[in-house]
Amino acid sequence: MSSKSCQGKSTEIDTSEDAQINEILLNKINKILSIVLEENKALKNYKEKLSSQESMTMTSYNKPSLSILDYLYRIQSYTEAEDNTIIIGLMYIDRICEQSSIILTPYNLHRLVFVAILMAIKYNEDVCFEFEFYAKIAGIPIKELKMLEREFVELIKFHFYIGKDEFDKYKSYIDDIEIELDKKEWLHFYKIFLEKNDILFLLLNEKYLYIGILFYLY
């Protein structure tokens, strides 16, 4: 499929590095998205929000069989999207969730991720491909993909620009996600430990034994 030139870059963020599949980055994004899905599922009005989104083009009738991690691999492999472009796509999804009633669910996650990265490519990179090419990667008919793009533009309210400071802060969060998750996990275990006040609990969870004993003694 031949490529065509798109508009030049209109952002301060560098997306010029050679594209390749960044497994570390994609795994971190997968963890973030998985956490968001679980947190949304725990919402009291989750079923109500699911029902309110059923009529949207962004919502699929069935859960995709391909995992979101494999889907991310597929997207970066075929589009050759830069790492920073992938991150910008994630930031676009955050913006939409912040300024609309949309929440991430297993029924809209894949479509939102694909269209977000597609828009990030169009807005931040010099070269893009024809719609037919993107539709094949997404596994969505061309007409439907165009509808998804229009819906996405309306949801984000044409707010595609991302400043360098905002990007750097977001990227730093992704880079440190493992540390943040460890902190969250430790706080969860420490809370249980305080409730149980039981050394045996820590012995059964060796990862927290040393720190836990210090808290227990002091």
Where are these regions (language model features)?
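Channel- or pocket-lining gating/hinge segments that regulate access to a cavity or pore
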Residues: 129-164, 168-175
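Alpha-helical segment that forms one wall of the substrate-binding/catalytic cleft
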Residues: 89, 113, 152
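Acidic, Ser/Thr/Pro-rich regulatory low-complexity segments at or just upstream of the first helical elements
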Residues: 1-84, 88, 92-102, 164-218
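Short helix-interrupting loop/turn segments at helix-coil junctions
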Residues: 82-84, 120-128, 162
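Hydrophobic residues within the alpha-helices of tandem HEAT/HEAT-like
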Residues: 93-97, 120, 157
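Short conserved catalytic/interaction loops centered on acidic-Pro-aromatic/His motifs
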Residues: 103-107, 123-138
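Intrinsically disordered, low-complexity regulatory regions enriched in Ser/Pro/Gly/Thr
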Residues: 80, 105-112, 145
